[in-house]
Amino acid sequence: MDMPQMKRPKDVEKWVGEIKDFKAVVEEFTGNEVTPEKLHAATVLLNKRRKALERVFACRKADPAPISGKDALLMMQIAFFDDPQRCTDMANALADELEKRIADGVGVAPAGTKRILLAGTPMAIPNWKMHHLVETSGAVVVCEECCTGTRYFEHQVDETPTDTDGQIMALAQRYMKNNCACFTPNTGRIDDLLRLCKEYKVDGVIDVNLKFC
């Protein structure tokens, strides 16, 4: 799929066209029609998954941090290919556990441990090197501003459209809200980083830049 690099109205329309082309390929390859009912059910399910993942990240704002960055990253990496309902259930169960840890004052590192935000390139399995380096050096990773982090779950897809065209437009609009590094100009990403630094009370930011990405 050809991802637009700007967010003008014509870029949104271009992305709508890409989604429609992808839908046609999926239907031809699988022999299954993508109906409004099926698309609505999938949208609702994936919105629930986003909310569950967001609950876990909200817990990471606590000090002491109730979960290591490496464990949180593994959850996000698995979310890309796990069954969506199972992922939602397990993420909510994890959030329940983390909320109890916060209430009990339990953390993976002492309160006051330096808090790091990783930004930039997504980190796919088995890429845990940056988290390992940070967390074996006396700090804790509390947030990832990348596609295996906040970009994956921020912003819900509008569930109100009842026809396929409206649903595809809702999908396009949701994904265009992401401030991916491929967009230009990209002041929105700077705003996101500043917001996340405040929300997660970070002491430092490390920008991860995967060569050739």
Protein language model features and the residues they cover:
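A charged, amphipathic alpha-helical module
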Residues: 16, 24-153, 159, 186
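Trp/Phe/Arg-rich N-terminal binding region typifying the photolyase-homology
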Residues: 1-36, 143, 147-148, 153-213
